[in-house]
Amino acid sequence: MEERKPITHITAGLVIAGLVIVFAIITNFLGLTQQKSLGFLQYLLIIGGLMFFVNQFGKANNYTKSFGDLFAFGFKSTAVFTSLYIVFIIIFFLLFPDIKEKSLEMARQQMEQSPNVTDEQIDKGMEIARKFFWVGVVGGSLLVFVIVGAIGSLLGAAITKKQPHNPFDQPAV
């Protein structure tokens, strides 16, 4: 078989982060952040990217990697793109504070639509949302991306062909 240079998890993470960041910028500036289906599209983009890169990693290693090796590659890629995305989202909200205010206002509107919530509860909820905004953004992004990354890594490792070397098949010396 021909010798292939394996792709690194850093490269895979950078490419996926780039795709997700471009997608986030486009949806924010086009005002499409309220559409839930686009959020799911972002997760499918991550899962599809991980499956592609895990498969390419297996292919570059002549499919000799085990399920655990392939999953680890995908999860390390997840760590890279999650870290980059969190840095991006912090910088993005600092550069565009109006987007933070719009997201808080959307949260207020959703609370106002609920008939069981009083104005006092809405004000208290908004106070808490403002106080813990950064914890919610960073923690929420971290949690969701790690879960989605684990799913993508599992699927990528599962669909990649595996022909690991058996250590007992080595010729005697």
Model-derived features: positions:
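Short, charged juxtamembrane terminal tails flanking transmembrane helices
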Residues: 1-6, 161-173
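Transmembrane alpha-helical insertion/packing segments
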Residues: 1-56
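Alpha-helical transmembrane segments of multi-pass membrane proteins
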Residues: 7-15, 72-84
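Alpha-helical transmembrane segments of multipass membrane proteins
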Residues: 19-27, 46-50, 81-89, 148, ...
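Membrane-helix interface/capping segments
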Residues: 56-70
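Functional transmembrane-helix hotspots
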Residues: 88-114
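Short membrane-interface loop/juxtamembrane segments of multi-pass integral membrane proteins
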Residues: 110-133
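Transmembrane alpha-helical segments in integral membrane proteins
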Residues: 134-162
